[in-house]
């Protein structure tokens, strides 16, 4: 059997493996479909993650250096690529009561022919309803961060909303904002194909940031007022600068991206200073949730799964391209790393 592994920075390969015996609380899944994570995972793949030499210390709530003799946060050769899998249970441990052999499930896991997952008190291992879409299922993770971004920005009926970056998170945020009652939804992305999809699913306008004063265009489209909410998913300094320029007085930027380091030139002394801008950093998996105890990571996940499975959210167009597992190393390097403009969220079939 084979699994997709990062053997070196920016190098993916299929590597042979043998499954261990499952524990009493586990199930083994034969994977049929899967998808990688195009945001934080590719940062790891490029060896650009702070987690390589540092760890986020929960006690101090800050990054601290890893001890010199401790394992690195990412070890190439062992680093398995992939985020979500859909497949069929082929083996159950003796303590597993909520699942049975033959069940079709979705869960967190790497791109490999089989995945072993805890199946006792694990709500994250989801049963696939009859006839449900695997493409919607593998968007379970990005949907959570999109929902968190929309909720943390307090999008309300009638708001002018802008979503910057139309990858999977941004595309889902477009749908959620429109369905939440936003009167004008604007997408921002330089890739025409992504903009076409956003328009099909709720965007009233799309802007190409290349050669465009995005902030001024947002003001123009909203009668000079600006956006009540801007959801920033791209992580680029220019995008945040434009968002501050296009934000309405007292508006909110929901910063969802795991940002790249900003180069010299980013300026908080212009529109941000005069327009009482608010920036909220949004991360679905940071606990406690801003709306705790009413909302938690679990409630976000439960809600997203329901919306994905009942068709409220439509992610069929987002899984593009779809490649075979046999071709996944080359496809990962091309579509996820080297040419991300050629994809939104890559799907994998086994």
From Swiss-Prot:
InterPro entries: ADH-like_C, GroES-like_sf, NAD(P)-bd_dom_sf. It is an enzyme of class 1 (oxidoreductase). Keywords: Carbohydrate metabolism, Metal-binding, NAD, Oxidoreductase, Zinc. The keyword Oxidoreductase applies. Catalyzes the NAD(+)-dependent oxidation of the hydroxyl group at C3 of D-gulosides leading to 3-dehydro-D-gulosides. Probably functions in a metabolic pathway that transforms D-gulosides to D-glucosides. Is also able to catalyze the reverse reactions, i.e. the NADH-dependent reduction of the oxo group at C3 of 3-dehydro-D-gulosides leading to D-gulosides. In vitro, can oxidize D-gulose and methyl beta-D-guloside, and reduce methyl alpha-3-dehydro-D-guloside and methyl beta-3-dehydro-D-guloside. However, the actual specific physiological substrates for this metabolic pathway are unknown. GO terms for molecular function: metal ion binding; oxidoreductase activity. Its cofactor is Zn(2+). Pfam families: ADH_zinc_N (PF00107). The gene is ycjQ. Binds 1 Zn(2+) ions per subunit. PANTHER family: D-GULOSIDE 3-DEHYDROGENASE, NAD-DEPENDENT ALCOHOL DEHYDROGENASE. This is D-guloside 3-dehydrogenase.
